[in-house]
Each structure stands twice: as C-alpha cells, then as structure tokens.
Amino acid sequence: MSKGEKVGKERRRYPRLQGLYLLSYINKERGVQKTGVSMARTINISPVGVGVEVYEAINRDSVMEMEIAVRDIVYAVQGKVIHSQEKSSGNYVIGIQFDQVQKELGKKL
C-alpha cells in the first residue's frame, strides 16, 4: 500500500490513513513518567488517533505526550493508549486515542 492509502473497508468518522511519520514520545502511567524521550514511527494516523510501532512494552491507559512530524510541521499532541500488541519481532504496536481532535493535522494528511 502506498502512503495515504486507506486501510481496509473504513467505517470510522475519521478514517485512518497509512503513513510513515516519525514521532517522539514520553510515556506516563498514573502521572509518573515511565520513560525518557523515546522515538517511534507511525503505522497509521487520523485526526483522532495514531497507530505506532515502539520497541518497548507500553501499558494500556498510559498517557502519551508526543510530537509528530508531518511534512514540514511538528504537532504536539497528547493521548491515551487504548491497545497494545506484541509483534513476533519483539516490537509492539500500540493504538493511541488523542485527547482532542487534531483538525489541523487532519488537513496535512
């Protein structure tokens, strides 16, 4: 699939688009920072959330403070991990729901 292509049959209000963007993040659990600043890459993204591949386990309900670079703009966003799944490679795929709809980000996708 190419960048920006819809994934499967989409029924969401804000469809997730496949896209590879770099992001930095800080993971917080119950208000306590669990990691230093770490790097990851997006798998899919929409104005309401993002799928991310990371190299460490991150628990559900963790708060993620992120900076996502999309084209020439860096977006500072915050969200909550709604699912986490370990891959056979040992990496993890996590789904993050943003705290607020990112309309400006959606315009860049």
Task: Go through each PLM region and give its residues.
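N-terminal helix initiation/capping motif
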Residues: 1-45
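Short, surface-exposed secondary-structure edge patches
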Residues: 14, 53-57, 73
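Short solvent-exposed strand/turn elements
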Residues: 24, 60, 92-109
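Residue-level recognition of beta-strand microenvironments
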Residues: 26, 45, 84-85, 101
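Short strand-loop-strand
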Residues: 26-61, 65, 95
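Conserved hydrophobic positions within beta-strands
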Residues: 42, 79-81
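Short, Lys/Arg- and Gly-enriched loop/turn segments at beta-strand edges
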Residues: 72-78
